[in-house]
Amino acid sequence: METTPKRSKTLLMSNGEERRSMTFGIEMLPDDLVLSCLARVPRMYYPILSLVSKRFRSFLTSTELYQTRNLLGSTESFLFVCLRIVNDSNPLRLFTLCRRPNSLTKVMVPILSPDSIPKFLPDVVLVGSNIYVIGGLINNNASHKVMVMDCRSHTWREAQGTCVARVSPSACVLDGKIYVAGGCKNLDATMWMEVFDTKTESWEFVSSPGEEICRDLTSCESIGYDGNVYVESMKTYGLYELHKGRWREGQYSMSRGGSLSSQCVIDNVLYRSWSYMVEWYDSENKLWNSLKGLEKLFIVTNQYVPTKCVNYGGKLAVFWLEKVYAKHLHQETKIWCAVITIERRKKEEIWGTREWFDLVFTTNEEMVDLTHVFAATL
């Protein structure tokens, strides 16, 4: 007599019962195995996994998980965007770029920030997996405050404050240290710039370039590049370079035609995005050259285009802002993003290939500034 094969127990389970069985099985694993499993999962699934249990939520925000991801080579680059929305009750807004559910498109998702963060005229930098918000106005007074957001967990803490209270300072990063210049009422040149060691969380003043130069640099922009700190005056557009603790005039060609805040470094080459172009700096010939292959990158071509760019895991991520008007009335503000792969074909020729681009943010607000973009490896 022929017998009917028994169906497996798993097949007889409802979907809910099967999921509970799988979850129970994973929960029985020791910590190191759970960490090893989670470290292999793309971060886009972490919000869903955090709903499994308190234990999972604890793992997903732990430093051990990210150390394991690093050891396994499972790290990913994530983009963060800082906007200033003038008419908003919280003008300093931080976003992360996330993939839409069940889609390949991406969108800027807001990150909650505490009320204690300086919202008016701070500067913002990224070091490792931490975003630092430095100085700014609190109750109409210049602030010493430094707030730090961990990009892995989106949690905030307060760090050691600056030596001098600063409003609208210029900050840049070099070798894991944060150099902060300008933004202080006191014109004492010895206090004009200070540096923050992110490992020891301590501040100290940097040697002064002299009172005359400091007066020129009360409003400035800066960048860390090739072992030096470069500072550009927003009044005279003079460029100065801090090299091995000494100040000297920088190469004017490095900042000519653009601003340091729109530049980034990839493989020790400076790139900048401004108006309708993406360019790279030939440090030997002291010339800016167009990145070939990107003639039609920007959709908007009839007006100045505010842009920012960042090193995105060896690729170039470019953000640009478009304001849409109808009959001279503002309709909406859009932010676009493109990711560009870079290839050096000749010594004096670098090509870019647009990997993807998309509209990532839309708002009805007109007074929107694209202030910073960052890429964190997590």
Swiss-Prot record:
Disulfide bond annotation, renumbered to this chain: none
Pfam families per UniProt: F-box (PF00646), Kelch_FKB95 (PF25210)
Keywords assigned: Kelch repeat, Repeat
Domain F-box: 23-69
Kelch repeats: 130-176, 178-227, 262-308
InterPro entries according to UniProt: F-box-like_dom_sf, F-box/kelch-repeat_ARATH, F-box_dom, Kelch-typ_b-propeller, Kelch_1
SMART domains xrefs: FBOX, Kelch
Listed name of the protein: Putative F-box/kelch-repeat protein At3g43710
